[in-house]
Amino acid sequence: MSRRPNFGGMGMGNMQGLIKQAKKMQQQMEAEQANLATQEFVGKSADDMVVATFSGDRQLKDLKIDKEAIDPDDPDMLQDLVIDAVNKGIKAVDDATQASMGKYTKGLM
């Protein structure tokens, strides 16, 4: 007499249900990612002298630099402002991604 493998009490119907549920979750995640990609996120430096705009898929779309930020005698200041704005923009994307996708990844890591 052959025995079927034991899946911890899960019959094949339950396994198919899990697969169906996983596919549905994958579709929902892909829809969330597509939605995020259409959104814009902004990072601003001190006094809004540099403004970096990102898409939800972390692509830099625009970088505006106020002419007051351009001082030939102090290029380090402009570098710091750009870094600050870019980092804040990336953080805004990451925060939105976590808020949107966190419900799917909770407990997986």
UniProtKB/Swiss-Prot annotation:
Family, per entry: Belongs to the YbaB/EbfC family.
SUPFAM superfamilies in the record: YbaB-like
Compartment(s) where it occurs, according to its Swiss-Prot or TrEMBL record: Cytoplasm, Nucleoid
Listed name of the protein: Nucleoid-associated protein LGAS_0369
GO CC terms of this entry: bacterial nucleoid; cytosol
One Pfam family this sequence matches: YbaB_DNA_bd
Function comment: Binds to DNA and alters its conformation. May be involved in regulation of gene expression, nucleoid organization and DNA protection.
Summary of subunit composition and partner proteins: Homodimer.
GO molecular function, one term: DNA binding
